[in-house]
Amino acid sequence: MKKLLVIDFREKIKYEDAWDLQKKLHDLRVKDTIYDTLILLEHFPVITLGKFGDEKNLLKTKEELKSMGIDFIRVDRGGDITYHGPSQLVGYFIFKVDGVKNFVLKVEKSIINVLHEYGIEAKESIEYPGVWVEDRKITAIGIAIKKRVSYHGFALNVNNDLAPFSYIIPCGLKDKKVTSILKEANFSPPMEDVKRKVCLSVVKEFGFDSFMVFNFSSCKELSNFGMLLEDL
């Protein structure tokens, strides 16, 4: 049986805490201590810049961001610069990976399936990573792979404030706009419904037989996660 573990945070999580969690779970996955794991959450406002990103794509000073309550963090994922914040669904994939290109395509297809269910004609782009509605980006994707195990993932705009994207050149792409489910479908689905649809779509695209969801409010609650897995 090919199982998927889903860690679902019901409260907003600081980016640094989620990053530390990914590293710990990545080590466990490399050792085959855990199954492939999908983390679903919302972040407090933060702008992240990928390892090959250009800081020139940040249009505000770090002091200005701080005054607005937005953190700025350099990270080791692919991609350039992006924004995370409340009401945006972020998913981190701690998966064994055989081929990078095929893996990214499956991530994109997983999100596209969900958006189609909401009546949004989303698609992938041959030229740029992520998920698009015409020339508007609705989902950013940035992946890192180490020892054949992935981390980082996607950020799907649900009904989040899009104004902070004007503080950056999203993903380093000039003249490209961002959008959200709310903007495209004229309604805002409950976040729990979006999460459920994402889980089902990931199961389908990656060929899992089943999935198990564990709900948490903070990263500290995961201290006994390894012990819990031993009982599965």
UniProtKB/Swiss-Prot annotation:
Pathway: Protein modification; protein lipoylation via endogenous pathway; protein N(6)-(lipoyl)lysine from octanoyl-[acyl-carrier-protein]: step 1/2. Gene3D superfamilies: Bira Bifunctional Protein, Domain 2. One of its GO terms (biological process) is protein modification process. Substrate binds at residues 77-84, 140-142, 153-155. It is found in: Cytoplasm. Its main location: cytoplasm. Residues 32-219 form the BPL/LPL catalytic domain. It is an enzyme of class 2 (transferase). Coiled coil: none annotated. InterPro entries: aa-tRNA-synth_II/BPL/LPL (IPR045864), BPL_LPL_catalytic (IPR004143), Octanoyltransferase (IPR000544), Octanoyltransferase_CS (IPR020605). The record marks 137 as: Lowers pKa of active site Cys. It catalyses: octanoyl-[ACP] + L-lysyl-[protein] = N(6)-octanoyl-L-lysyl-[protein] + holo-[ACP] + H(+). GO terms for molecular function: lipoyl(octanoyl) transferase activity. Pfam families: LplA-B_cat (PF21948). The keyword Acyltransferase applies. Keywords: Acyltransferase, Cytoplasm, Transferase. It comes from the Bacteria. Transmembrane segments: none annotated. The active site is at 171 (acyl-thioester intermediate). Its EC number is 2.3.1.181. In the reaction, the free carboxyl group of octanoic acid is attached via an amide linkage to the epsilon-amino group of a specific lysine residue of lipoyl domains of lipoate-dependent enzymes. Catalyzes the transfer of endogenously produced octanoic acid from octanoyl-acyl-carrier-protein onto the lipoyl domains of lipoate-dependent enzymes. Lipoyl-ACP can also act as a substrate although octanoyl-ACP is likely to be the physiological substrate. This is Octanoyltransferase. The gene is lipB.
